[in-house]
Amino acid sequence: SILKETPYVVAGSMQRHQQTATLALNECFPEAEIITDSAWNEFNHQQVFAQYEPRFNEPHLLKEDVAKEDNPRAYLAKIFEGAIERWTGGDYHHEYEESWPDFKTRVETALQNLCDELAKTKPRYAVVFTSGGVISVAAGKVLGLSPNKTFALNWAITNSSMTTLRLVGNEPQLLSLNEHHFIKV
């Protein structure tokens, strides 16, 4: 185990967050309590893609389009970039269940609330099980990044990777991002 004692644990309420948290903790710290907080949930990718291109409201159509391309990853990156630019751009906030400013505020508030709680309770370690968009926004906040640079991070984040922050008082500092050398392929 990377950690020397039972951590303070938070997980988003999405199934993948809960499953990953349970699996990881059962291996290392079965006694750990998981605090579920939906503020750590991912944004609605499907809606962000569908508002950019209505056909993509059917996820299989996006998969079919991507599969037809000579360079599927580059094509998907282009679609992702366009969809994110539309979502974060400001002209269409009213068209989303959760606008970019609302998502950004939700994540930044969750991060600050966690930092405040950890500064008070002072556990040696804390672990949050969440998703790439949330991690990108949290890292973007700490680093002062623009939405475009924030989502450039999102595109690079690997599932089950680790990002490490440390607290100075109740202010987070980024120590590492997207560590995944421990994942065996």
What are the roles of these predicted feature ranges?
Residues L61-D102:
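Short glycine/proline- and acidic residue-enriched helix-loop micro-motifs
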Residues S146-E171:
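Domain-level recognition of soluble alpha/beta enzyme cores
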Residues I2-K78:
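Phosphate-coordination/substrate-recognition cap region in phosphate-metabolizing enzymes
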